[in-house]
């Protein structure tokens, strides 16, 4: 199988990730619930990953909260910062993991920057959204649909200058682009463990620049006499038993990235994305590709996108088609009615993947514009 759906989850995990998970299941009990060797091994496994994440993202280990996925972390962050009916500035490329929690809070959503790959438009409209009285901001680092890398450093500076607290959705950038909690000055940065960080499904990280409000309450192994959640990190946001085998795999994924280098992986992904986009353009497809591009390409063939993905799947190629849980992004790009076929490269991106994909894509009909 040629796997080109890394925007959904990384696949073909590194061997050390799988080994770490198997070892954890063989050696670890429950962390923070006992002083016997298997419990201590579990606690050490969790702390080791917390330390690695702190190094990776430039923060203290205590600021690293483990979640079940990026959506979980975003919900914690949004319910901490956004009050019911509050005004929130977002980009024009947000995932439903951002917009649905905001909708549930009855927030007034101010959408900024609807032009693909246009930093000037993004920054101008984001500045206008902040100036119109935004109480908070939430924005993605990279569009999950189009691979558009947003100018988050400048957006973060605008928020800091106006005293607007903000959340960064690093679902498509963690493990692929540099992300630093102190450099950005974010209140929270949410990310999955199973995408660019190469960990397993069911893992995620929330970097906390402030104390979050608990989304769940329960046992933490600390301050058990109290009926309130602890008022310190990370315990305040980690109720219940942690996913220790998953956290072990996440640690191994970050170690792999540190050894290989995220810049090297990004360059390989971007190179294949460009080759893919150029090849699709030669075939006559409608392709979305621009200057500020990660390792993802979206295109519209001359047929139903889901049908095109099924044809590719029968040829052993895994891509994703449809709206990708991001209707705001499709509205911005004018593809809300059609959706797109998304090709997203991963840490093992190479020429063969692109070549085989383009050979199969050549069998798809071309859209008449």
Regions found by a protein language model. Give the residues of each.
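Pyridoxal 5′-phosphate
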Residues: 1-369
